[in-house]
């Protein structure tokens, strides 16, 4: 998982979600696209 100041969708399968006040990107197609804002 990447921790970034600015999270962006990296492909069309990426979804931006907010979990417990933390913005995250989850991706079903490419697990390397997982990100967390921090």
Curated annotation (Swiss-Prot):
Gene Ontology molecular function: structural constituent of ribosome
Keyword Transport: no
GO cellular component: cytoplasm; ribonucleoprotein complex; ribosome
Top-level taxonomic group: Bacteria
UniProt keyword list: Ribonucleoprotein, Ribosomal protein
One example of a Gene Ontology biological process annotation: translation
Similarity-based family: Belongs to the bacterial ribosomal protein bL36 family.
Name recorded for this polypeptide: Large ribosomal subunit protein bL36
Organism name: Pseudomonas putida (strain ATCC 47054 / DSM 6125 / CFBP 8728 / NCIMB 11950 / KT2440)
């Amino acid at each position: 998982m990447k921790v970034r100041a600015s999270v962006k969708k990296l492909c069309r399968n990426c979804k931006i979600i907010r979990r417990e006040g933390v913005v995250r990107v989850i991706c079903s197609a490419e697990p390397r696209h997982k990100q967390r804002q921090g």
